[in-house]
C-alpha cells in the first residue's frame, strides 16, 4: 500500500524541476523528490513498480521477464533512492528517457556495434547528450578511427542510440551533398571484364564477379541497389563517400562508370588499373582412354612400377587394382614428359587399331588464367517420380564434363601450371536396369588440384570398369518359332574388363594458330589443312604443317621482322630447309650478340 503526496506540493515542485532538468542527462529522474513508502505482502514486483510510477504521475514500462514476488516495507526520501534500492535487490536495470521509465532484468543488457560512415563517434556522443539520451552508466567505447562505437545497455537505450546514429548519418550526408560537387568518369577496361559472368553447368551455376562488383564490395558497405545499363539489371551499391556515388558496369563498352567526388577519382583509377591486368591463355586437352585390362602389357607399362620416360625417369602410376600400393601411398596420378606421353599415346593408337583400346573422348578447352571454364557433353533422360498427390519428371544427366581453373606459377625461368580440376565421366550401363526398369548410371568423378610443369602431362588412372555385353544369335525364321525356336537360338554373355585413363595436357598458348598462319610465306595451306585430323594446338599434324610454312625466303622473312618491330617485338632469323633451297624462319625473342639478322623492338618513346 502506497501513501500519496499532497497535490498542491506536487504541482509547485513539478514546475520548478522541469526548468532545472531541461538539460539534464538521462540518468536523473525529474520526478518530485518527496518520500515514498510502500508495504508489500507477497505482491508482484511488476505491480509494485507500476504503482510506484502511478504515484508520481509517470509512465513505467516493466519487462515481461520481471515476475518476482515482493514482501516487506520500503521507505525512501526520494523516488531515485527507492529505484536504486529495488534494482539492487532484484537485479534490475532502469533507464529513463525523459518521458517513460523502462525497467529490465540485468540479463537483458545487450551490446551493439555501430558503424559510422559520414560522422564520427564524438559527434554522435554530443548528439546523444543534447537530446537527453546519453547515459554514462552504460558502456561506450569508440575505436581509434572514431568510426566504430561499441555500445552496451538495456534494449530501449540501444534503440535510441541506433536511431540517433541513423538520423545523424542522414543529416551529415544531406549536408555534404549540398556543399560537395560530383564528378563522372569512364574507365575503359582492356583485359578484365566490367560486368559479372555466370557459368552454367548441369543444374548449377557459378558467378565470376566483374571489376564493377569487386569495386562495390571493396568500397561500400551499403545496401545493394539495382541499376539498369543497356537493358540489363546489374547489382550496384552506393559508396561510402555519398549516397549519390555509384559504380556501374557498361557491358557494351566493357567500361566502369564512376560517379563520386573528384578527390576520390584517383583512388578508383589506381584500383581499376591494378585489376585490369592481362592473363595468360591456357589450353587443356583431356583424353579419356579405355584399355583392355588383358592388353596392359602391350603399352610397355608396368602398372606396379611405372613408365620409363625419355629422360629415364621412372613414373609410378597407381591403379585401383593395386590395393597394397594405394593403401601405402594413396596416389592415383603421375606426371610424364613429352617423350613419355608420345610413347604412351603411340601404343594406345596401336591397341585402338587392334580393337583393344578406345579413345572415348578428347575435348580441348582454352581459357584464361584464374578464369573458370567448363565443357560439358551430356545426355539427360527423365524419370517419373510419383508422390502422394503429385507426379513430376526428374532429369538424370550423365556424360563427360571438364571444369577447371588454371593458374600460372613462375619462379625465375621455370613455369608451372596449377590446375583446379573437376572431371566427371558418366555413362549408361548396357543391359542393366534397376527398380521399375530405370537404367543404371555409372559415374566417375575426379576432383583434385595438381601442379604440372612446362611440357608435362598429368595422368590419372587407372580405374577398372567391368562391362557385360549380351549377344543373341539365331537361325533366320527357325529361331522365331515358339518353343521349338529355342533350339535354333543361342545367347552368349561376354564380360570385358577395361582400365580407364584420364590424360590431361595443359599448355600455355603464346600466340595461337592464327599467329603462325600470319607469319607464313604466302603459300596456300588449304590443301594441307584438309588433311589435318584435329584443328587445335594439341594436333601434331597441324603443328608440322604450320612449322613448314614458316620457312620462307630472306626477303619475306625480313618483311615479317619489320612487322614485328612495328608491334614492339624483337626477332631474329634461323636457317631452315625449303623444298629446293635454304630458307629463313622468324623467331620472336630478345637479340644477343651471337645472333645474326636480329631486329630489336624500338624503345618506348623512340620512333
Swiss-Prot record:
InterPro entries cross-referenced by the UniProt entry: Bact_Secretion_Sys_Channel (IPR050810), NolW-like (IPR005644), NolW-like_sf (IPR038591), T2SS/T3SS_dom (IPR004846), T2SS_GspD_CS (IPR004845), T3S_SPI-1_N0 (IPR049034), T3SS_OM_pore_YscC (IPR003522)
Secretion signal span: 1-26
Disruption phenotype: Mutant does not secrete Yop proteins.
Keyword field contains Cytoplasm: no
Note: The secretion channel formed by SctC remains closed in the absence of the other components of the T3SS.
Domain notes: The oligomeric secretin consists of an outer membrane ring connected via a thin cylindrical wall to a conical, periplasmic region that exposes N-terminal petals connected by flexible linkers. These petals harbor the binding site of YscD/SctD, a component of the inner membrane ring.
Name of the protein described by the UniProt record: Type 3 secretion system secretin
Organism lineage string: Bacteria, Pseudomonadati, Pseudomonadota, Gammaproteobacteria, Enterobacterales
Name of encoding gene: sctC
Amino acid at each position: 500500500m502506497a501513501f500519496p503526496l499532497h497535490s498542491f506540493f506536487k504541482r509547485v515542485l513539478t514546475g520548478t524541476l522541469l526548468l532545472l532538468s531541461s538539460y539534464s542527462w538521462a540518468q536523473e529522474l525529474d520526478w518530485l523528490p518527496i518520500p515514498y513508502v510502500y508495504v508489500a505482502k507477497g505482491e508482484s514486483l511488476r505491480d509494485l513498480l507500476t504503482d510506484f510510477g502511478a504515484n508520481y504521475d509517470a509512465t513505467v514500462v516493466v519487462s515481461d521477464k520481471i515476475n518476482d514476488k515482493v514482501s516487506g516495507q520500503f521507505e525512501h526520501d526520494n523516488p531515485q533512492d527507492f529505484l536504486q534500492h529495488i534494482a539492487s535487490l532484484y537485479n534490475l536495470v532502469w533507464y529513463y528517457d525523459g518521458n517513460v521509465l523502462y525497467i529490465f532484468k540485468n540479463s537483458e543488457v545487450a551490446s551493439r556495434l555501430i558503424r559510422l560512415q559520414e560522422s564520427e563517434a564524438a559527434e554522435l556522443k554530443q548528439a546523444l547528450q543534447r537530446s537527453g539520451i546519453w547515459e554514462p552508466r552504460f558502456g561506450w567505447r569508440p575505436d581509434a578511427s572514431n568510426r566504430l562505437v561499441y555500445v552496451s545497455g538495456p534494449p530501449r537505450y540501444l534503440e535510441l542510440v541506433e536511431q540517433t546514429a541513423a538520423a545523424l548519418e542522414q543529416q551529415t550526408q544531406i549536408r555534404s551533398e549540398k556543399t560537395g560537387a560530383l564528378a563522372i568518369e569512364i574507365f575503359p577496361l582492356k583485359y578484365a571484364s566490367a560486368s559479372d559472368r555466370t557459368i552454367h553447368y548441369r543444374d548449377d551455376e557459378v558467378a565470376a564477379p566483374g571489376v564493377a562488383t569487386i569495386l562495390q564490395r571493396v568500397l561500400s558497405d551499403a545496401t545493394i541497389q539495382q541499376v539498369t545499363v543497356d537493358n540489363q539489371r546489374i547489382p550496384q551499391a552506393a559508396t561510402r563517400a555519398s549516397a549519390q556515388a555509384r559504380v556501374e558496369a557498361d557491358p557494351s563498352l566493357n567500361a566502369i562508370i564512376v560517379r563520386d567526388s573528384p578527390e576520390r577519382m584517383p583512388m578508383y583509377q589506381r584500383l581499376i588499373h591494378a585489376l585490369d591486368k592481362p592473363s595468360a591463355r591456357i589450353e587443356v586437352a583431356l583424353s579419356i582412354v579405355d584399355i583392355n585390362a588383358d592388353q596392359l602389357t602391350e603399352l610397355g607399362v608396368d602398372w606396379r612400377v611405372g613408365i620409363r620416360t625419355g629422360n629415364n625417369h621412372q613414373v609410378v602410376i597407381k591403379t585401383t587394382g593395386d590395393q597394397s600400393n594405394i593403401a601405402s601411398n594413396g596416389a592415383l596420378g603421375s606426371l610424364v614428359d613429352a617423350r613419355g606421353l608420345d610413347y604412351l599415346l603411340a601404343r594406345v593408337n596401336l591397341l585402338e587399331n587392334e580393337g583393344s583400346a578406345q579413345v572415348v573422348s578428347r575435348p580441348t578447352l582454352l581459357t584464361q588464367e584464374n578464369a573458370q571454364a567448363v565443357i560439358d557433353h551430356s545426355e539427360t533422360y527423365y524419370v517419373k517420380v510419383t508422390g502422394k498427390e503429385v507426379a513430376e519428371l526428374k532429369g538424370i544427366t550423365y556424360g563427360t564434363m571438364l571444369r577447371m581453373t588454371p593458374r600460372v606459377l613462375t619462379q625465375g625461368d621455370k613455369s608451372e601450371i596449377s590446375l583446379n580440376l573437376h572431371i566427371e565421366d558418366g555413362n549408361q550401363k548396357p543391359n542393366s536396369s534397376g527398380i521399375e526398369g530405370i537404367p543404371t548410371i555409372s559415374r566417375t568423378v575426379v576432383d583434385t588440384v595438381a601442379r604440372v610443369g612446362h611440357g608435362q602431362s598429368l595422368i590419372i588412372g587407372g580405374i577398372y570398369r567391368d562391362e557385360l555385353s549380351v549377344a543373341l544369335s539365331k537361325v533366320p525364321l527357325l529361331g522365331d518359332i515358339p518353343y521349338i525356336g529355342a533350339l535354333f537360338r543361342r545367347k552368349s554373355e561376354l564380360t570385358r574388363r577395361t582400365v580407364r585413363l584420364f590424360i590431361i595436357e595443359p599448355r600455355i598458348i603464346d600466340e595461337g594458330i592464327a599467329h603462325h598462319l600470319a607469319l607464313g610465306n604466302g603459300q596456300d595451306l588449304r590443301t594441307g589443312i584438309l588433311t589435318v585430323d584435329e584443328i587445335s594446338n594439341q594436333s601434331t599434324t597441324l603443328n608440322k604443317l604450320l612449322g613448314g610454312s614458316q620457312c620462307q625466303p630472306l626477303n619475306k622473312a625480313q618483311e615479317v621482322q619489320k612487322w614485328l618491330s612495328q608491334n614492339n617485338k624483337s626477332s631474329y632469323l634461323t636457317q631452315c630447309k625449303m623444298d629446293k633451297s635454304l630458307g629463313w624462319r622468324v623467331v620472336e625473342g630478345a637479340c644477343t650478340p651471337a645472333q645474326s639478322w636480329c631486329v630489336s623492338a624500338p624503345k618506348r618513346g623512340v620512333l
